[in-house]
Curated annotation (Swiss-Prot):
It comes from Mus musculus (Mouse). One of its GO terms (cellular component) is glycosylphosphatidylinositol-N-acetylglucosaminyltransferase (GPI-GnT) complex. It is found in: Endoplasmic reticulum membrane. The chain crosses the membrane at residues 67-87, 88-108, 153-173, 239-259. The lineage of its organism: Eukaryota, Metazoa, Chordata, Craniata, Vertebrata. This is Phosphatidylinositol N-acetylglucosaminyltransferase subunit C. The gene is Pigc. It holds the Pfam family GPI2.
Amino acid sequence: MCAQRVTDTPEVKWQKVLYERQPFPDNYVDQRFLEELRKNIYARKYQYWAVVFESSVVIQQLCSVCVFVVIWWYMDEGLLAPQWLFGTGLASSLVGYVLFDLIDGGDGRKKSGRTRWADLKSTLVFITFTYGFSPVLKTLTESVSTDTIYAMAVFMLLGHLIFFDYGANAAIVSSTLSLNMAIFASVCLASRLPRSLHAFIMVTFAIQIFALWPMLQKKLKAYTPRSYVGVTLLFAFSAFGGLLSISAVGAILFALLLFSISCLCPYYLIHLQLFKENIHGPWDEAEIKEDLSRFLS
């Protein structure tokens, strides 16, 4: 049955109520029925370059995984001396440690209450225990086939990327799980290296690139966005160059992946905003904005 429209008379006006009898048909739709309808009043409008900037967090983690795998391949092939990697990683960690304090003027350290002596002790304890257990790490998975080790490493690195904290407030985010999966992947790959020294340095490098490096990048992003963009570009080109030295096809696919995430996906997101339709009105559920904590104590 088609809806019938009846012109309101000055004497009787239609009201949006159910508890009064009105002289209108049941299927009557007044012209003022949707006058309180609002669309997209709380919708967030994204800007293209802002989305590109935020996508750099994903780029950073993809490059970290790529660099880690490239370094492992070089060590496995005997093209990279473990002593050189350890020295370079140690020097880079010292530079990053100094920058971490200089970026915010030491405010983060004051808030956390952690001293440099405590950091030094933690570092020495970690290096000592990792070096002591490196023979165990080297022989931990000897009974497991190499194909299984590689499959486990790939699975763990994918899990690291999935559960990593990219800044989104989601239930799937778990920084602890993400880091543990990355370390487990490093242990799996380190067990296939020639010597225990290689395994020790590989696990140490994994801590540096998967635990310490994201902390520095997060602070760079918050305090010096331009420097953060420059470091991200340099890191991406380094990862691309390292992968190119191993496989040209893999490097091209990796570059296409980075381009899609940083350029095409933000453009697609901006384009989808045209189709966003969130409606609001008096039918919305009531929201209690008053602080009710005093009633719960």
